[in-house]
A protein has these predicted regions:
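Short beta-strand segments
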Residues: 15-45, 61-65
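Charged, gly/pro-rich active-site loop segments
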Residues: 2, 72-145
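Short acidic (Asp/Glu) patches
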Residues: 45-46, 60-65, 105-114
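Short, solvent-exposed aromatic-acidic interface loops
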Residues: 44-48, 99-100
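Extreme N-terminal tail/first-helix region
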Residues: 1-18, 72
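Helix-adjacent hinge/juxtasegments
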Residues: 49-83
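A generic structural signal for short beta-strands and their flanking turns/coil linkers
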Residues: 14-16, 28, 35, 55-59, ...
């Protein structure tokens, strides 16, 4: 990957929404965690994403922002083969806190269940994408006063 004009790790630490594409093509928005050089997102047998990745693990994922007020437009595009790996609560908590805040009492019950239900019974898994390619681009522009 060529060196982008912005800090990719800092960009990916923000609670942005990514979009992940599977064969078909099918694209869906996902919340993610960027850790250990990988994108982590929750899935399970209740989601079409789970079956699509089992059938064909080739995916593409984009995280971007477009701020019309400031002219900041940045994107990170990852491609590779996704893996379905066992869910762990500690990482799950980090991911959900990133989007919902630290106070679980304020969370919608469906998110609390990810942390307190048995992942084996529920079927909760991580989709982990270690990018085979990662492209970061800054397309920002100057805004006229």
């Amino acid at each position: 990957m060529a060196s982008p004009d912005f800090d990719v790790d800092a960009f990916l630490q923000q609670p942005l929404t990514a979009r992940i594409a599977t064969s078909g093509p099918t694209v869906r928005p996902v919340w993610f965690l960027w850790e250990e050089g990988a994108f982590w997102t929750l899935t399970g047998p209740w989601a079409r994403l789970f079956d699509r990745v089992k059938d064909d693990p080739s995916v593409a994922l984009v995280v971007d922002e477009c701020d019309l007020v400031t002219g900041r437009v940045r994107q990170v595009i990852a491609r590779g083969r996704a893996e379905l790996v066992p869910f762990d609560v500690v990482r799950g908590r980090r991911k959900l806190v990133r989007y919902l805040g630290v106070d679980e009492a304020l969370w919608d019950a469906r998110f609390v269940h990810y942390l307190h239900d048995d992942p084996g019974e529920r079927g909760t898994m991580w989709l982990r994408l270690v990018p085979a390619s990662l492209t970061a681009t800054d397309l920002s522009y100057s805004v006229a006063p």
